[in-house]
Amino acid sequence: MLSHFSRATLRSVSLFLVTLVAACSPHAAQAGASNSLMDISADGKLLACSNRDSGTVTVVSLANHKVLREIQVGKHPEGVSFIGDSHNLAVAVYGEDKVLLVSAPDGGVIGAVDVFDEPYGVVSTADGSRLFVTLDYPGQIVEIDTKTRKPIRTIEAGPFARGIALGPKGERLYVTEFYTSTVRAFDIESGKVADEWKGSSTDNLARQLVVNPRRPKVYLSHIRSRVNEAHGSGSIFPYVAVPDTRPGEGSRRRRVPMDTFGQGRITANPWEVGINPDGTQLYIVFAGTNELFAANIEDDDYRELVFRRMIIAGNNPRAVRVSPDDQTVYVYNALDFQVLALKTSDLSNVATIDVTTNPLTSEVHRGKILFYSALPPMVGRRWISCSSCHPDGQPDGRTWKNPEGLRNTQSFAGMAYTHPVHWSADRDEVQDFEHTIRGPLMQGQGLIRGAVNPPLGKLNKGLSADLDALAAYADSHDFSLSPHSKGGLSDAAKRGRTIFFSEKANCASCHSGPFLTDSKPLSPDKLIRHDVGTGNDDPGEKMGPAYDTPTLLGLYRTGPWLHHGKATTLAEVFTKNNPNDKHGVTSHLKENDISDLVEFLKALPYEQPVPDVARVSKVEKK
């Protein structure tokens, strides 16, 4: 029969078959298609891993799973991406407000691009000509020309933008908000929002997402923060959300609960997801319960994911990537400082790679492991850890209905120098949180053997090495300088500073000293608390109306404000939430004066406080 076909026809049939095979083959891997703490080069030869605690990026040869080099990049690197099909890297250095371009083969710095603040996720176009970087604060996408190494466009992305991914055709960017899990699609050419998938009011902590290369689906992990449920079996839940990118009505977004997904195994704190090259497998890492889940992606628009298998990965897994040949899945255990190489078929171990040495003291390291753990002895029912509400020491952007009343989650920055702790100053040492560990919220066994001293009573410090380690980690967080004062205080901020320190406004009578707080760890009968008129508007309040004075440093990024979170802007602190001038005398201020005062507050800190001068040692009580 073949004799009846001409050579031209045979060539056409051959070309058709080649095209058909290519269309049915796994989607070609593109390095940097979604943000992560890890990335794999397009040719599958190198892996790069961002080490947040070490301030480094480690380059690994995937031919033999050996470390080639560890490159110093700066404070708290987050996202890392190979640039196009090259072996050059882009690193989002979160703590230094820059994107660093480095050569993976020799570790040399190619260039650095300064950005406004907090670069988190970074992805590269397939041709390597452009980088797109999310700025956690103030919620922007920065486009960078890799040839000139300069920013060429800034796109407003929504508050606290973290996760970022390129669509399969390279025409869209998908971005997720950290505190809402809202996903937006941006048309790259115009920079405008092309589509949006909102999360529910309880969705929280969505830091990364991936796009299916073959199906119109996006996948992101997040938690639900149910602020009206202050107990360990109802407040925090793990999810994977699956937005449908096809046009249509309704939410076009499904949620897959992870606490019942793995054959009834409760998990906590999903951190990242990874997808294989042909879009048929999804991998999820859980930083609280130290697990890796593997799931089949279903083409059913209903279940979306079907559990395949799981393993215990290691301490605090934060990243997962799949090799371009779909043979190996890599998991980054952040607090083991290791990357695991696992077979995709059965998740058996191929190699364990030490990517950095532990840069933390042994005490802080142990405390950090406990802080992120949703396992005994910290937690009894696995759903929650300290980091569920205080990720990396930052607030979760929520106001919780706690037993004592409404409480807005506070930052840990500077906490070592601003004791006592809590809005009500009801804990004078971090070790007092043994009561939280054993209480309804965490339902853990606890870290002290035997009885616990009451809060504000005798010290719990020294009763447990683990509890002291937890305190050491909690007290290790420092401030970042405000991006609003990088060039010094603006004229408006200077005018606001004059108002703030004026005798008439009276702000500095409470917000004093290097940390702008009069909070001190005194004996219970001498604790300094103030009634600022905000403690009588909630019928559930049990401990007001006087509250501890919070530091104002870093205030620009910790909204909503006040103990009950009812000030949605800083201006509202002085307008809607300052009855009878009890929280500073501001009723006489004009609108432009309030604006200047806000500019000053946003500029804090414009220099680092001096803790040696400010620190007050804890009062020893009998």
PLM feature spans:
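A general, composition-driven signal for non-globular sequence regions
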Residues: 1, 5-6, 21, 39, ...
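Intrinsically disordered and other compositionally biased segments
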Residues: 10-13, 23, 412
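Predominantly soluble domains enriched in secretory-pathway, periplasmic, or organellar proteins
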Residues: 18-20, 24-374
